[in-house]
A protein has these predicted regions:
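Hydrophobic h-region of N-terminal signal peptides that target proteins for export
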Residues: 11-22
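Conserved "landmark" site that anchors the functional core of diverse proteins
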Residues: 213
């Protein structure tokens, strides 16, 4: 198997095993109960394009959460956030995410794959599985493609069946980042290619990702430990307060 095919096969396994069930309601509490690292993002409301991020960790699943630092600013989708697939029944309030809506997904999602321009050898501080972005690395957002919501090396596929994709190596804000395990068993049209990545500044916004300062992102990538089952918890501030006890959030 050549390098491109190996990359594609590995990515398919990783992204397909992130735990998000298409067409199935996700039970966030068991995920949170097992986790020892949380990246918590809250926004003032559903249409807010800015918010805050704070890191929490604990020694064991039975230990109390402790904050690692003070909140830092983030930007989200150009039209705010919306309930991601698997979380449609959590609340009667709030929109539901769809492809191209410019909204970042709300819910609880695994964080277990890093990416960047640099080769793996120069990213040794990153403990997550890591993908070096090549000129041929695409994230497919074409809902008609068999590769929808998948990061692939287009040079390794027998037939490129998509007409729309992010050419990731061409995006400067993807110099470093983390794949969010959203819509991993893809529900067509419910959103794709969701990442944590470098922002263009505090007044910017994204197409549906969560972005922030590069130095903080590099710190986060070195902090994330796959053995601690890290999660992204992304909610409006009101929903975080409402769900805090039920989901056993910090």
């Amino acid at each position: 198997m050549n390098r491109g095919k190996t990359l594609r096969a590995w990515l398919a396994v990783v992204i397909g095993s992130l735990g998000c069930q298409a067409h199935t309601r996700i039970a966030p509490r068991p995920l949170i109960e097992r986790a020892e690292q949380l990246v918590v993002v809250t926004t003032p409301g559903w249409t807010s394009t800015t918010g805050s991020l704070q890191l929490f960790e604990r020694a064991t699943p039975d230990s109390p959460w402790r904050s690692l630092d003070l909140p830092v600013p983030v930007v989200v989708g150009r039209t705010g956030i919306a309930w991601g697939v698997g979380f449609d029944g959590v609340s009667s309030e709030g929109p539901h995410k769809h492809e191209g809506d410019g909204k970042a997904p709300a819910g609880v999602f695994p964080l277990d794959t890093g990416f960047g321009f640099a080769p793996r050898d120069s990213m040794r501080a990153v403990r997550l599985p890591y993908v070096q972005l090549l000129p041929t690395t695409d994230c497919v957002d074409d809902t008609a493609s068999a590769h929808y919501n998948t990061v692939v090396d287009r040079s390794s596929v027998s037939r490129v069946d998509w007409t729309s994709a992010e050419h990731m190596r061409q995006v400067g804000q993807y110099e470093v980042g983390v794949i969010v395990g959203y819509n991993a068993k893809p529900a067509k049209g419910r959103g794709s290619c969701i990442f944590l990545h470098i922002w263009a500044g505090p007044q910017s916004h994204t197409a549906g990702c969560t972005a922030f300062d590069e130095a903080k992102l590099r710190y986060l990538m070195a902090w994330l430990d796959p053995e601690k089952r890290p999660l992204l918890v992304q909610l409006t501030a009101n929903d975080y307060a409402t769900l805090r006890v039920r989901w056993k959030l910090p």
